[in-house]
Amino acid sequence: MLNEFKAFIARGNVMDLAVGVIIGGAFGGIVKSLVDDLIMPIVGAIFGGFDFSNYFLPLSSAVNAPTLAAARAQGAVFAYGSFLTVLINFLILAWIIFLMVKGVNYLRMQVERQEEAAPEELPPPPADVQLLTEIRDLLARRPAV
């Protein structure tokens, strides 16, 4: 059973998936920082200098705090600004993954086209067939009697 597990792990698809998950996790942090630290401040400046991550609607009359963190401590809130930030984060990540998959598919198609265009070399015939072919050719060149 251990050997079967080793064979399963050693297959390319499982290793590719593991690498993809690790890189995706790291890349997700990069995209989150891009959205939180670069894009959302620009969007906030365009719309009057507001920080979208602090936009919320109180769902209880007991909530009267000015920031999202304090409002959450007081009660239930509808944090639509935080959702907008996460949504933009997701859209950027999905777009980048789409472009990466599109690039990989393009490269894969190029390789397939090259393989189709290259003529396949036939393996040499067996030795007995080669010998019979040579005998036939010699007999064909021999003058008729």
From Swiss-Prot:
One of its GO terms (molecular function) is mechanosensitive monoatomic ion channel activity. SUPFAM superfamilies: Gated mechanosensitive channel. Its main location: membrane. It is found in: Cell inner membrane. Belongs to the MscL family. Homopentamer. This is Large-conductance mechanosensitive channel. It comes from Rhizobium etli (strain CIAT 652).
